[in-house]
């Protein structure tokens, strides 16, 4: 994570609804998407929502600067577009968003960000 710790998904997911996001902070859509996530995090964190954001950015310094003020868990895969983790989730393009239920089951691959809040509420 941005503090130099190895933060595993399992350490934040236990008993929580988790939004997993594969992203690239250098992309032009990233700030708007993070604002949307911020709104959702503010509204639903107390109800059990966690966000686990995986950056595939090449530039570690840019990533640290972009992620340092975000309240959720932000990690970076140094393999970037060759990420084995992204391959496990069949990520072909960014952003890629998934929702895990409180038992850690993958319940949704989000195709429409406009429906993200409804998708989260249905799992909370």
Give, region by region, the residue ranges found by the protein language model:
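A short beta-strand-turn-helix
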Residues: 1-18
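Flexible loop/turn segments at secondary-structure boundaries
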Residues: 6-7, 28-29, 59-62, 82-84, ...
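Active-site acidic short loop of glycosyltransferases
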Residues: 14-15, 46, 91-94
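Conserved redox-active cysteine motifs that mediate thiol-disulfide chemistry
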Residues: 17-39
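Hydrophobic beta-strand anchors of alpha/beta hydrolase catalytic cores
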Residues: 19-20, 51, 97
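Structural microenvironment flanking redox-active thiols in thiol-disulfide oxidoreductases
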Residues: 31-68, 80-86
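Short acidic-hydrophobic, aromatic-tinged amphipathic segments that line or gate anion-handling sites
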Residues: 73-78, 110
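Thiol/disulfide oxidoreductase modules built on the thioredoxin-like
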Residues: 81-123
